[in-house]
């Protein structure tokens, strides 16, 4: 059996991370999202000056306005952060 590629391993890690914070209910509420951000994106939060950052992220991700972040919305969060990181990389790091 072939070992998973690095990208496949990363995808599995993102999937497992979502379920770690969502639990059996298969979505994250605001508290779950806060725990995820504190645990997995602490550097990102540290650089935010707005105390409402988590509430704004929750509002952006909560498509149905039920106070829930589903897996699709979580993927949107990850994709948005990856895009921002890529833009930074292209602008600052790649030029070195």
From Swiss-Prot:
Subunit annotation: Tetramer of 2 light chains (p10) and 2 heavy chains (annexin II).
A GO molecular function held by the record: calcium ion binding
InterPro entries recorded: EF-hand-dom_pair (IPR011992), S100-A10 (IPR028476), S100_Ca-bd_sub (IPR013787)
Protein's UniProt name: Protein S100-A10
Gene3D superfamilies linked to this entry: EF-hand
GO CC annotation terms, alphabetical: cytoplasm; extracellular space
SMART domains, per database record: S_100
Pfam families documented for this protein: S_100
CDD domains: S-100A10
Misc note: Does not appear to bind calcium. Contains 2 ancestral calcium site related to EF-hand domains that have lost their ability to bind calcium.
Ancestral calcium site: annotated segments: 62-73
Function summary: Because p10 induces the dimerization of annexin II (p36), it may function as a regulator of protein phosphorylation in that the p36 monomer is the preferred target (in vitro) of tyrosine-specific kinase.
């Amino acid at each position: 059996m072939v070992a998973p590629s690095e990208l496949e391993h990363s995808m599995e890690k993102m999937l497992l991370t979502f379920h770690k914070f969502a639990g059996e209910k298969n979505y994250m509420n605001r508290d779950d999202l806060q725990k995820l951000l504190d645990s997995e994106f602490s550097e990102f939060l540290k650089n935010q000056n707005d105390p409402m950052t988590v509430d704004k992220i929750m509002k952006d991700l909560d498509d149905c306005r039920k106070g829930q972040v589903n897996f699709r919305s979580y993927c949107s969060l990850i994709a948005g952060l990856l895009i921002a990181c890529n833009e930074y990389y292209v602008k600052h790091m790649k030029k070195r």
